[in-house]
């Protein structure tokens, strides 16, 4: 057989790359179609930030650790990611924000899975980096338009429910695990007849031995119809369709559709973006609203220096599809700094959001009329929090009181009634021009005169506070 002679130096030179030579381009002019990322980097001691930024750009696009001869078979200049800016993080030693631009052609259209696999799939284990956090993404209009987004959106949900001019009220049924399907349905009925708009499966309620999913769907549907008949209002329950596989997930969604309920639920991080996008498509085609729980998010977003900020996860969900998304409360038991939370709440609801670093928004985002996702505030909230919640979130939010409903001393229905009275009192006071930040306590106390249920709730929870310093601040 003939032998092939390889001439070194003919066209390419083998060896380990200095990423800065190719992927650090401070003179680059960002294109309107580029996907932009802001990474918080903590380099290892002695590693220049330019090298780290270039390495992140390389590994999340066309690069590898060494020169390869196949580089000459394509246009690296067209397809490579570029670290185009670096800035030190104020008040932090050896931390930098690296801005990276990715050509749109690197990503499959309409695929959050591919977007995340490329940008965060492999770079977080780099030895040159002590820590890395994706703070924000700019999704360009050209890429946004390849997604269908939420199945219906905020306005379509209000039209379907015939509920306007106030926030929506929800409640997670407790105990989250251990109830039989029939007792679970009883709890749902009591909450809905008392005045709530929704009740909810907890994120880990799927199909366990004590309560199989079909039994739960049946008893909950019966509770919904009974409460609707008594109150004259449209009611719903977030039936969790999260399942071991997509075929089973579709089966549960179809059962909910057959029962005629308005909304189902999915755990989008544990279930995965591919499954979530598929379920959103099913809901859009079959007239179901889709509530999204963010179970597992804190594993990814809690640490200030490493992981992915929740604003990125929220943007990804809006692309993938969800009509509701848990967003934190600012005032309850779960993590959430006010300005940062308001920043990603706007990214979920609004169509055009300007860059505002004071709220953690690194890039201007244009959603091109993609439907909005309604934020869900839940976690350790009760009637005394209502003025702050109405003032912070406004009307286009779902306020979810689990223990704050079921913990009422008189039972579920009085607990629901207390929350409904508090919400309507605060909404009316705001509409009359009162300052809920200063007068909220007075508004609640005045409403207690007309609602013994609210008065009892106020007495029970008057001393309850969750006073811990937030970890994730600007």
From Swiss-Prot:
Transmembrane segments: none annotated. GO terms for biological process: photorespiration; reductive pentose-phosphate cycle. InterPro entries: RuBisCO, RuBisCo_large_chain_AS, RuBisCO_lsu_C, RuBisCO_lsu_C_sf, RuBisCO_lsu_fd_N, RuBisCO_lsu_N_sf, RuBisCO_lsuI. HAMAP family: RuBisCO_L_type1. Binds 1 Mg(2+) ion per subunit. GO terms for cellular component: chloroplast. This is Ribulose bisphosphate carboxylase large chain. The disulfide bond which can form in the large chain dimeric partners within the hexadecamer appears to be associated with oxidative stress and protein turnover. RuBisCO catalyzes two reactions: the carboxylation of D-ribulose 1,5-bisphosphate, the primary event in carbon dioxide fixation, as well as the oxidative fragmentation of the pentose substrate in the photorespiration process. Both reactions occur simultaneously and in competition at the same active site. The lineage of its organism: Eukaryota, Viridiplantae, Chlorophyta, Ulvophyceae, Oltmannsiellopsidales. It is found in: Plastid, Chloroplast. Gene3D superfamilies: Ribulose bisphosphate carboxylase, large subunit, C-terminal domain, RuBisCO large subunit, N-terminal domain. Its cofactor is Mg(2+). The record marks 333 as: Transition state stabilizer. GO terms for molecular function: magnesium ion binding; monooxygenase activity; ribulose-bisphosphate carboxylase activity.
